[in-house]
Amino acid sequence: MFCKQKHKTRKKPAVNALMADLSDLSDDDLESLLENNVNRSVNQTVTRHRIPVQRDLFMNVLPNQQTFYEETHTDVSYGPTHHQLNEENLDEYIYPTNYEVRQYQYDIVRCALFENVLCAIPTGTGKTFIASTVMLNYYRWTKSSKIIFTAPTRPLVAQQIKACLGITGIPYSDTAILLDKSRKNREEIWQQKRVFFTTPQVVENDLKRGVLNPKDVVLLVIDEAHRARGNYAYVELTKFIDRFNTSYRLLALTATPAADLEGVQEVVNNLHISKIELRTEDSLDVARYMMRRDREMIEIGLIPEIEEVVEQIGIAIAPVLQEAIQLGIYESCEPHQINAFVAMQQSQKIILNPSIPEGLKWKNFFILQLLSQVGHMYRRLRIYGLRAFYNYFQNKYTEFTTKYSMKKSTNKTAANFFYSPILKTVIDKCKRRLEEPEFYSHEKLEYLNNELADFFTMAPSDSRAIIFTELRESALEIVKSIDILNDGALRPHIFIGQAKGKEHFDEETYIRKNKPKGRTKAARLRRIEEENRVEEEKKRQKEQAKLERTGRRTGSSEEAQLSGMNQKQQKKVISDFKKGIYNVLVCTSIGEEGLDIGEVDLIICFDSTSSPIKNIQRMGRTGRKRDGRIVLLFSGNEKFKFEQAMNDYENLQTAITHNALEYTKSDRILPPNVQPKCEEKFIIISNENDEVNKLEDSDEVIKYATQAMLGKLKTKKKEPKPKKTTAKAKKSSDKTFFMPDNVKEGFTSASSLLNKYTINEFGEKISLTPSVSKKAIKPKKEWNMLDEIEYDSVEISPAKSQVEQPSQPHKPTTTQGILTPDETTNHIPSASQGSSVQTDSHTVQEPVLKKLKLAHQIEDPSTSIEYYSGYELVPQYGATDSAQMLTMQEQRHFLKKYVPDTVHWSIAPDLAKSKTRKIRHVPKIEEILNTCQDMHTNTREKIIGMNRTNALARSIGYNRSVGMELEVMLPSIVVPNETITNAKNMTDLLEDEDGLSDFLSD
């Protein structure tokens, strides 16, 4: 029995928690810190449920069993938006009545104003009108926020420009079109305009360059939203904006969201959709506005020539298939059931399997490669006909036999197939049949021609027809078969993409490149001369063939099939199709979406696919403004695949309507207390905006709108061009890096992001407070043990004894060899007061020559003290301590002659900083610095011993005129390791003008 345990709530941290405790955060929580949750708060409630487990006889749970499972519930809430709202317009939203008010459009618009909506409605039912209405209202509701419409192609962008500007009346002065690759004035355009029509790639690039601030976006419209999968620009665009802005509206438009439920869920997740508005042609609120579409499905059998070829190929490939089945690399089937896609998948699995020996791996690969080629032959035979098969087979046959004859290939399996006598006989028959001018390589061609002839006989003169096929070879064959009818009423043309057609295997070129090359200069020259001659001959033949094609009616289609159609050629063909110069367009997949082809009355699908999206897009090209007809030609198992795909799509639509998807909650943007009411209003369009509705060509629409936005519609007098100057070009602005709110910029050390804990005696975790900066608590004291030491010899007077330093401590003076009281103890800290300085009141006796006695005797000098070092309280050794400081002889000598019992010389000067000056004599000072450097790598405290001949302590005077010699050991300085770690390096010290004095005193 399931038991519900007490649940716990976990709140995802906000951005301002970046400096908080990070030790207990999960990966998801850390990732959420990197996102800018501007006004979004996410709470996760985790509920644990017990699950039944197995127990032993003693009722103990058996090992390796899970005793519970967790159920996570996420609650998302939003705060006020960061956009500046126009309060006076929030009470209402405008619904244009310039066109007929349709209930489904009305409902979708109201929903899209307050939620992120995926609008999936049939082609031609007004998706652009819905987008324009939503754009209009957010233009009114906000003061300066950006509204962006994105589409993958220029024609789709042009359609939206016409719909938006021609319906909503948004002024040109606030709109911009960004389609070209030029980045000139792009930053100024983003700053000055509010409504943008562009492609997702342009927006993505400008966001990454820092030209567009993602926080300014309040509405993003995405057309053809079914592309928002994988790494497409739509996905990257929304990801980038979500990092900085969660308070924006997203409207996605498409006719088919995806082919399966997993694909729809991916689109929903990538675009953060909170609701799907789905309509079909059979929906009650849409059916009344749909034009009638008569759909006819025709099953066509195979001609005898095709059946014979299928049978003979099966006989030739049977031994190879049987071997593959025995090896276990292909499932058992009949030869005519070989599938190219299945064979290709199996070959990829074998290549990626490291456990198979290399020799066996490549043997199996070549077998499956041959089966895949045979699968392509079968598909071309059944769906496209004898000509498509013959061209493919002849290319593969020529390539293999050439390489095999030159011993560049040793594939005996493929050799047995291609050199099969039965196959050679069949190919010869195919060649003879294809040379007959009126021979139809597939029965589909005959049905297609009959359908076109009947349609244009009865249809009006302005009728148009489109034929869809996947292969370019098939498209050209269809154009030629229509041309053979010699019917003036049928004027076909091919319509394909920009890519060049695949070149067939050139036997002559391959042989010439792989034959033995002479090593002599003469042989090399002959080879180069021969290559040039062959290239010139090929060039001449191509020019001759092109000249011959221009004399035929299908010449332009043949040329397009070889070299592809660039955008200029595509535009011209579409323009001629709209004008009626061509009334039959034979398209590949390029004509399925993204092009404004115009009104079409007849659609013929020469082949079909297993993708419902492609099938729906093809059929959606007709029946937009008037009734249309759809003819589907099937052969082989095409009908089964088509019906299965459409049934799966219907099941998908049912699953979507029954809430089988997980949605993301979106920000309402408007305040909760604002409930705008609908105002149906007829919008008066300005003459400039209305002019765009009269344009048909997409490029003309874009050109006109661009000129209007730039204010160049009215003719102006041409101003004389300014003379060229040598002035430097204006420097481009620096790239802007947009950051989420409340983010600490700059570099942060890793130690500052960590919290340290300690465990007390009770086992409790106690947080340690962060260490205080040394610089912050460092007392500003001066320990000037050595003042103005510039010379390392006591026999030479300092050359710079008169340096004026206002902050310089009191210097010791002597009068006939007698030290004054303050000279001796002013700088010495008292043992009773730690680091504070106290002046001793005892008198000082006149020192005897060669022996300088200091008569100060109170308290036991061995008493140890603690003094504040600037960072922490550390114990210091007394004068009599022998913990690796001074030898016994040095201690006795030091205490006897120089140190009174009240004085403690364990002074650790702060070496954290020193002034930058210059030392003229460095030999002895370098020796001291080497000692400091040795201390840096040691864990203990060491003694820096300094001989009296190298430096004078402040407490000891020196009278050069007396000429006395001091044979004493100067006091040693105890320097803790902590104070040395931040000391200046030797190079800085050697450049110190005032020498070691400031190094020890600062």
Swiss-Prot record:
- Subunit and partners: Interacts with the MHF histone-fold complex to form the FANCM-MHF complex.
| Binding, ATP | 121-128
What is the protein's name according to its record?
ATP-dependent DNA helicase MPH1
Which PROSITE patterns does the protein's record reference? HELICASE_ATP_BIND_1 (PS51192), HELICASE_CTER (PS51194)
**Motif annotated as DEAH box, chain positions:** 223-226
Q: Kindly list the places in or outside the cell where this protein is found, as annotated in its UniProt entry.
A: Nucleus
Q: Which GO terms describe its biological process?
A: double-strand break repair via synthesis-dependent strand annealing; interstrand cross-link repair
Q: Which family does it belong to?
A: Belongs to the DEAD box helicase family. DEAH subfamily. FANCM sub-subfamily.
Q: Gene3D superfamilies, alphabetically?
A: P-loop containing nucleotide triphosphate hydrolases
Q: Which UniProt keywords apply?
A: ATP-binding, DNA damage, DNA repair, DNA-binding, Helicase, Hydrolase, Nucleotide-binding, Nucleus
Q: What class of enzyme is it?
A: hydrolase
According to the entry, every stretch annotated as the Helicase ATP-binding domain falls at: 108-275
Q: What is the lineage of its organism?
A: Eukaryota, Fungi, Dikarya, Ascomycota, Saccharomycotina
* The Helicase C-terminal domain, residue ranges: 506-669
List compositional bias (Basic and acidic residues) regions by residue number: 531-551
The main location is nucleus
Entry's Gene Ontology cellular component terms:
nucleus
MF (Gene Ontology): 3'-5' DNA helicase activity; ATP binding; ATP hydrolysis activity; four-way junction DNA binding; four-way junction helicase activity
What organism, scientifically named, is this protein from? Kluyveromyces lactis (strain ATCC 8585 / CBS 2359 / DSM 70799 / NBRC 1267 / NRRL Y-1140 / WM37)
Where does this protein have compositionally biased stretches of type Polar residues?
553-568
